[in-house]
């Protein structure tokens, strides 16, 4: 496992959700955080953290994200070819775009692409909009791109 220099990476909190466990005495609340980290040079990762307080959940998610960093093949400011990928019920289509187009992406896919260092890309998300599955589908699609 590579040791990453955390100062070079940016972190984006994609989603924070409150989850509830119903027990005999009432409800127990916890927080779940989804974080994406990237250095804008072709390295990106995501992590999920759960804790009783939001800052603790975010810290755990960042730690998990650094354990899941992958390398993305970037061709100039975009990707090399079209790709379509499905993870669970989330499906994502990624298409290369000409320079100056920008990142055209919705929801949870945008921070993944921006933190990977991709500046020009067209995307379409189909199926489920669950942030966790959409982030994972986007990262898996980027991993499958051949240089």
UniProtKB/Swiss-Prot annotation:
Q: Which Pfam families match?
A: Ribosomal_S5 (PF00333), Ribosomal_S5_C (PF03719)
Q: Which GO terms describe its biological process?
A: translation
Superkingdom, according to UniProt? Bacteria
One example GO MF annotation: structural constituent of ribosome
Q: List each copy of the S5 DRBM domain by range.
A: 9-72
Which InterPro entries does the record cross-reference, listed alphabetically?
Ribosomal_Su5_D2-typ_SF, Ribosomal_uS5, Ribosomal_uS5_bac-type, Ribosomal_uS5_C, Ribosomal_uS5_N, Ribosomal_uS5_N_CS, Ribsml_uS5_D2-typ_fold_subgr
Q: Which GO cellular component terms are attached?
A: small ribosomal subunit
This protein's record includes keyword Ribonucleoprotein:
yes
What does the record's free text say on domains?
The N-terminal domain interacts with the head of the 30S subunit; the C-terminal domain interacts with the body and contacts protein S4. The interaction surface between S4 and S5 is involved in control of translational fidelity.
Q: Mind telling me which HAMAP family this protein's record contains?
A: Ribosomal_uS5_B
Descriptive protein name: Small ribosomal subunit protein uS5
Q: Identify the species of origin.
A: Nitratiruptor sp. (strain SB155-2)
Q: What is the lineage of its organism?
A: Bacteria, Pseudomonadati, Campylobacterota, Epsilonproteobacteria, Nautiliales
């Amino acid at each position: 496992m590579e040791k990453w220099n955390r100062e070079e990476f940016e972190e984006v909190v994609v989603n924070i959700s409150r989850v509830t466990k119903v027990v005999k005495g009432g409800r127990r609340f916890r927080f779940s955080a989804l974080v994406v980290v990237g250095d804008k040079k072709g390295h990106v990762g995501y992590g999920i953290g759960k804790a009783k307080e939001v800052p603790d959940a975010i810290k755990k998610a960042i730690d998990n994200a650094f354990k899941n960093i992958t390398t993305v093949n970037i061709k100039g400011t975009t990707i090399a070819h079209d790709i379509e990928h499905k993870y669970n019920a989330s499906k994502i289509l990624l298409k290369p775009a000409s320079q100056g187009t920008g990142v055209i992406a919705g929801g949870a896919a945008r921070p993944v692409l921006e933190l990977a260092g991709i500046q020009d890309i067209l995307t379409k998300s189909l199926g489920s909009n669950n942030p966790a599955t959409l982030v994972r589908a986007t990262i898996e699609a980027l991993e499958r791109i051949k240089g």
